Amino acid sequence: MNIKSLLLGSAAALVAASGAQAADAIVAPEPEAVEYVRVCDAYGAGYFYIPGTEICLRVHGYVRYDVKGGDDVYSGTDRNGWDKGARFALRVSTGSETELGTLKTFTELRFNYAANNSGVDGKYGNETSSGTVMEFAYIQLGGLRVGIDESEFHTFTGYLGDVINDDVISAGSYRTGKISYTFTGGNGFSAVIALEQGGDNDGGYTGTTNYHIDGYMPDVVGGLKYAGGWGSIAGVVAYDSVIEEWAAKVRGDVNITDQFSVWLQGAYSSAATPDQNYGQWGGDWAVWGGLKYQATQKAAFNLQAAHDDWGKTAVTANVAYELVPGFTVTPEVSYTKFGGEWKNTVAEDNAWGGIVRFQRSF
């Protein structure tokens, strides 16, 4: 074998080896297309599709800080200093379409902190507390709603006014477990029926009392409403299965102009005591009323007044000012006159209090 043949053979072997290695090389796959989050506008602003599903999700809530001074207009006691409180509310909403209608869920977690002046003699006068609560958690399919929510005795008529101290004269307890169905017609008419577990200690004069049912019989709430461009009128009736008494409210709202609206609400209870789930005002009856004036795009003035059968009168006014979109500052002044039978429950007949609320909503 001559040198030329040896060189040609070696070159052929190298070419063959290179071809074999090329055949065994790993080929990188083509990159997959990135699936960006899609906006879902079927249920309002802020929703997006959960990737890989047709479920729309929204994460929202608010951060709030309150500073209070003067008297406690609920109890009539002097605070003897500033009360401060903070809250972070985290809300999660979902929505999707099914063959039985729109399926929605709503949950709200509240993280609360309070630093209240104790009024005792000492170097430091503040008492602090903090806690977390699952405020709401419900499922809604069409008009059917099940879970933890606020009582239809409040929500169906539209709560009270747009003031912070709106329930100095309480119109019933709030949070409850419930099963409700709301019918909504195309002509402005709607109706609701609800079976409720009874309120917890979110409401009213009695403070820490829970008004849960003590057997299988639920509380029952029913209501009718008619709404139009002029305003609305609504009425609700509630039966308290624990004390076997009933309470009712009727409310009317009128839009005078696009900027100015007024409302009036009257209530009656068959049990003349605030120690109950629904009729938590003093005596047989109570009345609330108020107005709202949207002075500018940023500033709104709110006023509310209330009076009950036992002689308590409560008046509150505020100005809600939106400094920038999503950030609102609300200074508020409240006055309570404890007259009639309420005089025996408080140390002072008159209470003046103020609060400033800072809230960032998102």
From Swiss-Prot:
One of its GO terms (biological process) is monoatomic ion transport. It is a multi-pass membrane protein. GO terms for molecular function: porin activity. Residues 1-22 form the signal peptide. Keywords: Cell outer membrane, Ion transport, Membrane, Porin, Signal, Transmembrane, Transmembrane beta strand, Transport. Pfam families: Porin_2 (PF02530). GO terms for cellular component: cell outer membrane; pore complex. The keyword Nuclease does not apply. The keyword rRNA processing does not apply. Homotrimer. The pore formed by Omp2a is larger than the one formed by Omp2b. Omp2b pores have optimal permeability to allow growth and protection against harmful compounds. The larger pore formed by Omp2a may be advantageous for intracellular growth, when the bacterium is competing with the host cell for nutrients whose concentration is particularly low within the phagosome. Consists of 16-stranded beta-barrel sheets, with large surface-exposed loops, that form a transmembrane pore at the center of each barrel. The pore is partially ocluded by a peptide loop that folds into the pore lumen. Forms passive diffusion pores that allow small molecular weight hydrophilic materials across the outer membrane. This is Porin Omp2b. It comes from Brucella melitensis biotype 1 (strain ATCC 23456 / CCUG 17765 / NCTC 10094 / 16M).
